[in-house]
Amino acid sequence: FFGSTTKAFTLRMLSVIWPFSEIIEDSSTRPILDRALDLCFLDGVLPQGTPISPMLTNIIMIPFDHAVFNSLRNFGGHHLVYTRYADDLTISGRYDFKWTDVAQFIESMFRKFDAPYRLNYEKTHYGSCAGRNWILGVMYNKDRKITLGKKRKDALRASICDYVRCRNADRAWGYTELKSLDGNISYFNSIEPEYTAALLEHYHTK
């Protein structure tokens, strides 16, 4: 996704988004934007792993997002909801729908916007509330709740257990290990606060 995003496409999309449209039209500010964008691109495309890449693509895809969102609100008799973060597109609905029709529509919108993107059908999944649906690293389960899944819960529990065991044996953890554990706990707490609180309470007494 990032490796397909060129500066030319970025400028074309920014030209229809305020206030970038005014910056591009103004001969005194256009060079500043050009220089700023040059710092964002590597070998003509956005590099993977930099903070600016998802931020920039989220901005330039606003016109595309609006067009797709509005079209899917009434698509083949279905009210579908479109969401996207970077290259992760999610289309959801209350009832079953033909996902291949939606995929073809998304492809047609890429062509309409002359976007340098194509759907990756190997990573395209269709699921229902009865199954396990993973979206951006979290799972929407059959109980219609967001969860991080058993494997991650087991890993966090094992990390906390290891920390408690080392603490009780006077074997101090290093700064990096502590920050990693603290980050994982904070992440869990933001998604499953009740589970996180119960887990911490359990090990607090150990």
Where are the language model's segments positioned?
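Short beta-strand
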Residues: 80-84
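Right-hand nucleic-acid polymerase module
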Residues: 2-50, 55-74, 78, 96-206
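Short beta-strand-to-loop capping motifs
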Residues: 91-95
